[in-house]
Amino acid sequence: MSYHNPPIPWRELEGRISGRPAPHGHQESHADQVGYRHVRKPFDRHPVRPEGPVVPYAELHCHSSYSFLDGASNPEDLVIRAVELGLSGLALTDHDGLYGVVRMAEAAEACGLSTIIGSELSIGVPEPQNGVADPVGSHLLVLANGPEGYRRLAEALTDAYLVEGGRKGRPVHDLDHLAEVADGHWTVLTGCRKGAVRQGLVKGMLQAEAELRRLVDLFGIDNVLVELTDHRAPTDSRDNDLLAELASRHSLLTVATTAAHYAGAEQFELACALSAVRARRSLDEMDGWLPPGPVARLRSGAEMADLFSRHRDAVDNTVAVAERTAFHLKSVRPRLPDQKVPDGHTPISWLRHLVEEGRRACYGDDPVAKDRLATELDLIEDRGFAGYFLIVSDIVEFAQSQGILCQGRGSAAASAVCYVLGITVVDPVFYGLPFERFLSVLREEEPDIDVDFDARRREEVIQYVYAKYGRRNAAQVADVITYRPRSAVRDMAKALGYSQGQQDAWSRQMERRSVPPLPHDPDGPEIPDDVTTLAQQVMGLPRHLGIHSAGMVLTREPVGRICPIEPARMFGRTVLQWDKEDCAWMGLVKFDLLGLGMLSALSISFDLISQHCGRFWTLASIPRNEPGVYDMLCRGDSIGVFQVESRAQIGALPRLKPRCFYDLAVEIGLIRPGPVQGGAVHPYIRRRTGVEPVTYPHPLLEPVLERTLGIPLFQEQLMQMATTVGNCTAADADLLRRAMGSKRGVERIDSLRTKLFEGMAANGIDDDTAQGIYARIESFANFGFAESHALSFAGLVYTSAWIKLHYPAVFLAALLRSQPMGFYSSATLVADARRHGVVTRRPDVARSSVGADLELLDACCEELGSEELETGIDECLHDHDESEIGAFDPNRDDGDHRRDTHFAVRLGLSDVSGINIETATRIVEERERESFASLDDLARRVDLSGEEVEALALAGAFDDLVGSRRGALWQIGQINGVAPGQLDVQVVTQPPLLPEPTQMELLGDDLRATGISTADHPVRQVRDALNRRGVVQVDRLDGVETRRRIEVAGVVTHRQRPGTAGGVTFLNLEDETGLLNVIVTPGAWRHYRRVARTSRALVVRGILERGDEGVMSLQADRLEALDLSVPTKSRDFR
């Protein structure tokens, strides 16, 4: 469910979290509000057509921003402008693709505008043309004649990209092949100045006539139109007269076009800037290639009639062409592929068979489960969705057969069918999850089943899908990469001719969730107004096409006949030209095959435990309800633990004190932007801690809200509230949930509201109470989290916490091998593990694996068996009952849980910056054949570049082999020229007596080479100076009184400004003893912006705040840069 919540000021946010009322009458300034967040919403604009008669005209040649840097208006804006101009129709003809047609069709459907779909094809292009001021080759403008013409155009584009020689940015079109595919279903225009006919005019009428005759011979005389355009170039009028003469000679119609590249004159400067970006030149360098004014804008019929007064029939002809070619895009919606089932079965009968097998295994003879499954299957059969479930089940079954960890997430966990098929792991019958949250009788489209896979092995699953369904019937969904603040500022500064250094400096000042500052903004970064003006305009326009992280589309007919397919930059992948919203609007079924880093980490953990400790664990066999796991979480000790490791979650854990599995689901659902904005956090915590009694809006709602202490948190509770007190059906309740989360759901809400109030009255609920219940449902609808999703993730929270508690060395190695993932950098994970007694060692060519691994702490451990190597108490080896957990006692010593005490973590060779997995693998494989005798021995046997050898030396990977880092760096000059296989002849020179590096120098080398300090922390190196200043260590804050002004110093690990924080920025400071959350108000951020934004480490002065459970933070009033002389990195505004 999407959120449509407005930004709230900090004072109100703080009041909602703390429970204290905000100051009465205070109004926050605009500067306190959150910045930019791009969300595509349904088209909801209402342009007004001109009054009175208009000159009929349809624009047949128009480029949107989906011509990627060759159009300055989004398709929706072009539709709006076309309606306001009174056009009879609008064609979208972007370069070599149908990228923007769904957006245009959606907007046109809402506005009642007739639309034509086409594309301007690039002919004779030897390579991608970005970086070229005037791209080579010629253009062929194609309009699809109805649905069949559209399918053939999509097919032709797919062929051009997937044919041998075709690649991203360079389709290979062959005119003969295009004519064969078209087979009379296209209307071909001769094009603008890049059209072959108009280009032929440069060489004379004979050449132009030859090009025109060729088009007629290929596509047919009834399907070729001569295009007239006038961009006020000196030769345009003469060229149009000559083209009209050619058309008359060959009995062809002429059509007048604008060859538009933007909606209105106000986009002209932006269009020029985008052209400069595409050409990789400045605007000054583009002089001569750009038009003199806003000539490529949409024009009204009256303007076109005036412009083409000598060729008025060319204007009139456009309307008949539009009527002949226009169609509704949704008419080409495809169907799912047929799933093969055993002989004698249909898809639904086979699904029922599989479900019955799963029911016996999961539920036995439980009548409640049996009835629930029967209800779900009946609805699945009625909606014709059996094939969808079989496809997902088959993909999951393949992954499980290959040992790939996977599990479904989201609303699918509310389906008992998904549960017994093994797609999800949450029992919806046990938790009472309503199936209608996942699929209801009022839902027409297929349900949405998202499945998480081990991120390392997700590619195997994707390639299985390609292999099973074929490259023409399966493709990944696109991700349209749009301009964000940094790229907007960088590209516009580049177009305006500013230096590379200026571009970099200004773009770095932009934060991920901000917007480029308005011109003359005194509080904004120091960026020139001409840059910010254009950056504001370009925000949100598409920059290039990427690939969606998870979505795949499968169709019965070739999907390339619905949407063109092109190669992705990633090897072995192909991608559609549409994003997920486009696919959804068109009814293409998307299968989300997500890669989850935590599943990778858990899979690696199980492998490491098995390999080094001899113990075999799986997701299913991890003992449940272990008190020690919940005790660890109650202490807020959750760095690295799935979903509960952010500073907000760590701060909430000691207050919520989770003592059972469901508490973990509540933690996941509660600490979210929505519940904070909805005011649910503090009331729940007050009730959880016994400060406030648990009450219910009405006794009938106690069964619904009991599990969340009378506070609605989950979307499923909204539905259950509506069915319990309002006598709504479950389908009505789901419709109410979706309507309340949509700006377009007002009419639906009104009808359901009446039904809900009638039901409450029938249940004897008085009007005041009913109004209160409805207000609670209404305010909660915008922020509720899916309970099914929270429960799915809660299992991974528990499992990752269990491994962190019992096998912290294993957990660290697994997290390092699964990067990038999670909230923290590798350096912070290592520092946290060090505080838990885990020893981490540098990479070593003689000992390291490819990735992080375990090794015994000392040689004496090698004599121990696997049972002796496992340490710690044994209560983790069996399940516990929830009744055994009891209340959390922070003073209780519950024993040593660690079972991998004899092991250290050895960083992998691939952890060294500049050493990829392939290189690390070669080193390990060669070492396993025979140990390396010396550095030059390694250089001869492994094909390493000089940069790779230096990177390993800087990381200390040769220390044992050579003796020191400086000694290794000295030897590199002798071996860089030695190739693999050369004779063992070397010149030996005595290295100079080099001084030993200082600890700070070694620390700097570590951080530069791996980003990780294995033995020390940067702040420890300046601790003496900080102590003399009175700066307090994080681990000593317990002894500092609340509300005292103090100074704390540390490395900045994160900078965050959540959308719910009203402009407040949160910093995480890390010293050698721990982490502290720093709160920077908008005023303080403005005052110290440069220091706060750019400093790698800070000394922060502020007021120490302490929550009810001792959770501490520092409210900053002064920030000062701390020079550590070593490189550190932070994760900013993610």
UniProtKB/Swiss-Prot annotation:
CDD domains the UniProt entry points to: DnaE_OBF
InterPro entries recorded: DNA_pol3_alpha_NTPase_dom (IPR011708), DNA_pol3_finger (IPR040982), DnaE2 (IPR023073), DnaE2/DnaE/PolC (IPR004805), DNAPol_HHH (IPR029460), NA-bd_OB_tRNA (IPR004365), PHP_dom (IPR004013), Pol/His_phosphatase_N (IPR003141)
Subcellular location: Cytoplasm
Disulfide bond residue pairs: none
EC numbers, comma separated: 2.7.7.7
Similarity section: Belongs to the DNA polymerase type-C family. DnaE2 subfamily.
Disordered as annotated region, ranges: 1-33
Entry protein name: Error-prone DNA polymerase
GO MF term set: 3'-5' exonuclease activity; DNA-directed DNA polymerase activity; nucleic acid binding
Chief place where the protein resides: cytoplasm
Reaction equations catalysed: DNA(n) + a 2'-deoxyribonucleoside 5'-triphosphate = DNA(n+1) + diphosphate
Function noted in UniProt: DNA polymerase involved in damage-induced mutagenesis and translesion synthesis (TLS). It is not the major replicative DNA polymerase.
Keywords tagged on the record: Cytoplasm, DNA damage, DNA repair, DNA replication, DNA-directed DNA polymerase, Nucleotidyltransferase, Transferase
Domain of life: Bacteria
